[in-house]
């Protein structure tokens, strides 16, 4: 896991253009790499469990009632599966290194989201950062929501997806700010009570 500043040194092709743009504006944040999410899935055998769960679904003729039940079970499976202790400690250290445990203030808000997407999960964090980790898992679980799975079935004929980066940013979910976007020469900018938090 890397701070935005560290991640930007690796280049947009490795960490995404939004992270590089945020780092250039000195936005504090952290990138949870796709490898971390992938390791979580594999460590608790989620690909096989999810494959068995969705086996009854025919992508050419989706029973939406059955799919709705299965997606609720899949979301619960992600939320209730545990990360390995080493992974948890790595996350906590990285969160602290990024200044997102707010140890100097006794706590603070963060939101987690995917690059380029406004929808997020929020948490009130105190050291070591358990609430932030739970928000990350809720975001990962949202990939298995009914609408998200239905879109994947329509577009790809399957329910699977690749791991993607997750961003952890200070404050609550941002909102579009056209004035900030214009000042930065961007089409869109998101801000919250801490300042700039998104340049998709």
Positions of the model-derived regions?
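N-terminal beta-alpha lobe that positions the nucleotide/phosphoryl donor
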Residues: 1-167, 175-176
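Conserved short secondary-structure elements within globular domains
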Residues: 170
């Amino acid at each position: 896991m890397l701070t935005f500043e560290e991640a930007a040194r690796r280049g947009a092709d490795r960490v995404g253009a939004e992270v590089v743009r945020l780092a250039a504006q000195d936005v504090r944040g952290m990138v949870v790499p796709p490898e971390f999410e992938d390791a979580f899935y594999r460590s608790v055998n989620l690909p096989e469990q999810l494959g068995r769960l969705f086996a009854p679904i025919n992508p050419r003729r989706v029973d939406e009632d059955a799919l709705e039940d299965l997606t609720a079970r899949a979301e619960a499976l992600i939320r209730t599966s545990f990360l390995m202790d080493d992974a948890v400690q790595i996350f906590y250290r990285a969160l602290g290194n990024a200044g997102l445990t707010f140890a100097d203030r006794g706590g603070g808000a963060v939101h987690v989201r995917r690059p380029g997407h406004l929808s997020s999960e929020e948490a009130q964090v105190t050291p070591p950062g358990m609430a932030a980790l739970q928000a990350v898992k809720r975001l990962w679980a949202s990939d298995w929501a009914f609408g998200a799975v239905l879109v994947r079935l329509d577009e790809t004929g399957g329910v699977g997806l690749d791991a993607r980066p997750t961003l952890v940013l200070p404050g609550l979910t941002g909102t579009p700010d056209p004035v900030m976007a214009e000042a930065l020469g961007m089409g869109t900018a998101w801000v919250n009570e801490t300042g700039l938090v998104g340049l998709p």
